[in-house]
């Protein structure tokens, strides 16, 4: 099983379709770079239809979920991409409805991981959903990855997703390198010390 440590350079050797049939829960730190860059289609090709916590995204633009809140502040091109993504509810993504058990887990994790997830309702919901439904989390959030590791929940972060995209021939290696280093990190300010490099067309996160 893939390690959930954010700081580790993990070699990915997963068959295409790895995510098929699995519960894949995405948080805002993954949705934002893929959607804002215009690559929401690539996220879908990699992971399929993702499940998203209600505090992270809502199909109603007026709601104040994490993803929605930036629409009013973003440059128009990015704002329109986010509005378009909201309209793809039921296709590219589905909003999760938390069960009573998951709500109990949210409160349990709120106390247990107070140091790492305080004030992060979206991350708490994401962790609870993935734990109860035996799912996988897509995130770039270090605190969430720490908590998920403690709960034996598998995580993938954006650089790893792009490595898989190259391995599965969804995108050329040079395009993935540019997308991650120049667009995600430099332009969209994704917080990451990692960079994606292509050596002999082999992608690596270092």
Segments from the language model and where they lie:
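Short secondary-structure transition/capping segments
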Residues: 149-153, 168-171
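Active-site-proximal, substrate-binding regions of enzyme catalytic domains
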Residues: 2-135, 142, 160-163, 177-184, ...
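Short secondary-structure boundary/hinge segments and terminal tails
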Residues: 61, 147-148, 166
């Amino acid at each position: 099983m893939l390690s959930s440590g954010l700081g580790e350079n993990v070699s990915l050797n997963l068959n295409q379709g790895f995510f098929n049939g699995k519960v894949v829960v995405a948080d805002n730190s993954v949705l934002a770079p893929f959607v804002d860059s215009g690559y929401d289609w690539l996220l879908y090709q990699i992971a399929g239809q993702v499940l998203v916590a209600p505090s992270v995204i809502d199909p109603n633009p007026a709601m104040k979920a994490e993803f929605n809140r930036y629409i009013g502040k973003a440059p128009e091109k990015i704002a329109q991409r986010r509005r378009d993504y909201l309209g793809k509810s039921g296709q590219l993504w589905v909003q999760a409805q938390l069960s009573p058990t998951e709500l109990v887990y949210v409160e349990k994790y709120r106390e247990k991981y107070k140091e790492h997830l305080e004030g992060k309702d979206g991350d708490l919901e994401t962790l609870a959903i993935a734990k109860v439904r035996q799912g996988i989390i897509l995130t770039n959030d270090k605190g969430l990855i720490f908590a998920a590791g403690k709960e034996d929940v598998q995580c993938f972060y954006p650089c790893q997703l792009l490595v898989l995209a190259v391995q599965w021939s969804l995108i050329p290696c040079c395009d993935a390198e540019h997308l991650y280093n120049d667009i995600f990190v430099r332009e969209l300010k994704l917080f990451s010390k990692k960079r994606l490099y292509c050596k002999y067309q082999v992608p690596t996160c270092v």
